[in-house]
Amino acid sequence: MLYDGIKGRIKTRNIQNNRHSVENILRWLRLQHCSPEDVHVVMEATGVYHERLATELHDAGFRVSLANPHRSREFARGMGIMTKTDKVDAYMLACYVFLKKPHRWEPPAPEIRYLGALLRRRDVLLGDALREENRLEKYLSTDTPADIISSCRRMAQLLREEVSNIERQIKAHIKASPALRRDYTLLTSIKSVGPQLGMHMLVVLRSHNFVSAEQAAAFLGVVPIEKRSGTSVRSRPRMSKIGPLS
């Protein structure tokens, strides 16, 4: 915790990211004579591991911001911070939120979070099914006992059945929500956007409050970068993979 600017007092506390995190944070803040409304929390977006904590902090009344890890490391280098430890990162992120004033994060609607969870589960199961099918192909091409082949075939079939079950749940969920159904229909009406891409685009676009196509492109990392200076620096344009500013 950073008090009174980057030159002010610093308080640190290690808190595990689990189901009791918000309760522990609130208890510690009470000892510091602070309330959620007094605190601006910033955390790096780390896959899906930040999502529950960010949502629970938001629901508890905190102002929450998410930082792009690449951007925060650039910020750290700009401050001359080369060391990377939890304590140093916490100080760097506190400075980041104080100086950059990142926008307030709002959690996606419950129907979007549920759709995202279904899609992630489908992707995991599909990957497992493909790996099991590759093993089956290998077993069929080698001297493998029949019991092993039967086991592999059953597992591949079970995984495919579960993929189909999840896909039915996804379709039913989209159909049950007028807003999701409308947006999904619009997305899949675009040439080259099929059902799977449409579902993933639906989650990305509805999970963030983009106000322009440029913002969405920056988030997805498809913004062209040109490197040209004078007569000596002329690199081929390429796509940015950095992602959003925050």
Language model feature labels by segment:
Residues 49-53:
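Short, well-ordered alpha-helical microsegments
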Residues 20-38:
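Short, basic/hydrophobic alpha-helical segments
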Residues 55-59, 65-189:
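Long, charge-rich intrinsically disordered scaffolds of nucleic-acid metabolism proteins
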Residues 37-46:
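Short glycine-rich phosphate-binding loop at a beta-alpha junction
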Residues 195, 200-246:
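Phosphate-backbone recognition surface of nucleic-acid-processing proteins
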Residues 1-21:
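Short glycine-rich, Thr/Ser-proximal phosphate-binding strand/loop in the N-terminal lobe
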Residues 1-5, 93, 200:
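Gly/Thr-rich phosphate-binding beta-strand-loop-beta motif of the actin/hexokinase/Hsp70
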